[in-house]
Regions:
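Hydrophobic alpha-helical connector segments
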Residues: 66-97, 144
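Amphipathic alpha-helical packing segments from all-alpha helical-bundle domains
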Residues: 65, 90-97, 106-142, 165
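Hydrophobic alpha-helical segments that form the core
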Residues: 93, 99, 134-172
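Helix N-cap/coil-helix junction residues
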Residues: 23, 132-133, 176
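Short, basic, alpha-helical segments at the C-terminal edge of helix-turn-helix-like DNA-binding modules
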Residues: 57-64
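N-terminal intrinsically disordered/low-complexity leader segments
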Residues: 1-5
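Helix-turn-helix
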Residues: 6-9, 13-51, 55
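Short amphipathic alpha-helical elements of helix-turn-helix/winged-helix folds
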Residues: 13-17, 86, 147
Length: 176
């Protein structure tokens, strides 16, 4: 007998499918088939597709901001440098997929706006801790975030050696 799936199992599968195939992959039948179960299991955990989408967006906000911030704060004496390495070195398929989804869905757009605000506030906080005045920190946080978004949406990542040099230069630019 197969182990019973949890809502978390469905969310994890949904995030993988979203990152790989986009929003069109977020339907009960293909997800159930990929997990080797009936779609009844899906509806046991989620009232409808909208509830599933809301759960996916909530989880994305957790992993794409709060988890990263907690990890950076716990593991680094230089949180800005650690944040740059972590975010610019990550696979960004899910980031692109959620932003594509947000182009035509109000709930996804709200989630993207919230995560953008959270990330900007955190970057600004890190820059202020490095001694920058509030207005300068805010402006540089915005520039740094636009740089990240351009990188995230531009496709395949740079080779590791080149990326490391770019990150060092970005750090110098925003900290000067």
């Amino acid at each position: 007998m197969a182990e019973q799936l949890t809502a978390d199992d469905w969310i994890k599968q949904g995030l993988k499918a979203l990152a790989r195939d986009g929003l069109t992959a977020l339907k009960a039948d293909p997800l159930a088939k990929a997990m080797g179960v009936s779609r009844g299991s899906f509806y046991w955990h989620f009232a409808d597709l909208g509830a599933f989408h809301a759960a996916l967006l909530k989880r994305w906000r957790e992993i794409a901001a709060e988890q990263i911030i907690a990890d950076v704060e716990a593991d680094s004496d230089e949180p800005l440098k650690a944040l740059l390495r972590r975010t610019f070195g990550a696979r960004l398929d899910l980031e692109r997929a959620v932003r594509n989804w947000a182009a035509f869905d109000a709930a996804a757009q709200t989630a993207v706006r919230a995560i953008d605000r959270r990330r900007l506030d955190y970057i600004e906080e890190l820059l202020r801790k490095r001694g920058l005045e509030a207005a300068t920190a805010r402006a540089r946080a915005q520039i740094l975030y636009w740089t990240f978004l351009g990188f995230a949406l531009s496709g395949p990542p740079s080779p590791a050696a080149r990326l490391e040099g770019l990150l060092e230069e970005i750090l110098r630019m925003v900290s000067a």
